[in-house]
Amino acid sequence: MAQKEEAAVATEAASQNGEDLENLDDPEKLKELIELPPFEIVTGERLPANFFKFQFRNVEYSSGRNKTFLCYVVEAQGKGGQVQASRGYLEDEHAAAHAEEAFFNTILPAFDPALRYNVTWYVSSSPCAACADRIIKTLSKTKNLRLLILVGRLFMWEEPEIQAALKKLKEAGCKLRIMKPQDFEYVWQNFVEQEEGESKAFQPWEDIQENFLYYEEKLADILK
């Protein structure tokens, strides 16, 4: 029974990361997956390619994608026109703090009133209601912040609570967009680890344009 439970835990961990599920009979591989910390915020400059290919894919039904991946670009401009820029990514477990909240807690916990902030997020899925509320509160008290959020998928978009939250984001001045194929390519080139000898070129999946149009229509209906 214990071995079955361990295998189930490992399967869940692997599926969330888009990892290969074929080698879970290997005791060492199983031990490695089980020992991964289950709930944490991970930050870095580039995310693994297999995570991107699985987590950012703009599928209609996102089964197994129980994390949020957030890639960010922060540009802080002073009165002299000089721009300080930074970029990176965060990932979360949905049972812990979400990536959107973690961004304001760890990446940009304070705002210099002498600077103007232009922040762009590329997120695997749109914010939940609680994260939308946190974003709205931050925007309301930080007049020198402009936030653009590009999302691969819409999270639980049929739920009235989520629709209301997305509308409130728009009303608060947050720009919300669906990621186009060109945006996925930008993330691939700027935020994804490239293995030695691997082609830098982005390889779009078969239904990337179709799914973009699907989500773009849904978002337009929600925000109108």
UniProtKB/Swiss-Prot annotation:
Q: Which InterPro entries match?
A: APOBEC_Cyt_Deaminase (IPR050610), CMP_dCMP_dom (IPR002125), Cytidine_deaminase-like (IPR016193)
CMP/dCMP-type deaminase domain mapped to chain residues:
64-169
Query: Catalytic center at which residues?
Result: 100
Which body tissues produce this protein? Expressed exclusively in heart and skeletal muscle.
Alphabetical list of PROSITE patterns matching this protein? CYT_DCMP_DEAMINASES_2
One GO CC annotation:
cytoplasm
| UniProt organism field | Homo sapiens
| Subunit architecture | Homotetramer.
Q: Which residues bind Zn(2+)?
A: 60, 98, 128, 131
Main EC class the enzyme belongs to: hydrolase
- Entry function: Probable C to U editing enzyme whose physiological substrate is not yet known. Does not display detectable apoB mRNA editing. Has a low intrinsic cytidine deaminase activity. May play a role in the epigenetic regulation of gene expression through the process of active DNA demethylation.
Question: Which terms does the record give in the GO molecular function aspect?
Answer: cytidine deaminase activity; identical protein binding; metal ion binding; RNA binding
Entry superkingdom: Eukaryota
Q: Which keywords fit this entry according to its UniProt record?
A: Hydrolase, Metal-binding, mRNA processing, Zinc
Family the entry assigns: Belongs to the cytidine and deoxycytidylate deaminase family.
PANTHER family according to UniProt: C-U-EDITING ENZYME APOBEC-2 (PTHR13857:SF4), MRNA EDITING ENZYME (PTHR13857)
One GO biological process term: mRNA processing
Reactions the enzyme catalyzes? cytidine(6666) in apoB mRNA + H2O + H(+) = uridine(6666) in apoB mRNA + NH4(+)
Q: Which cofactor does it need?
A: Zn(2+)
Which portions of this protein are annotated as coiled-coil regions? none
- Which residues does the annotated region (Disordered) include? 1-24
Q: List the protein's name.
A: C->U-editing enzyme APOBEC-2
Q: How is the cofactor bound?
A: Binds 1 Zn(2+) ion per subunit.
Its EC number is: 3.5.4.36
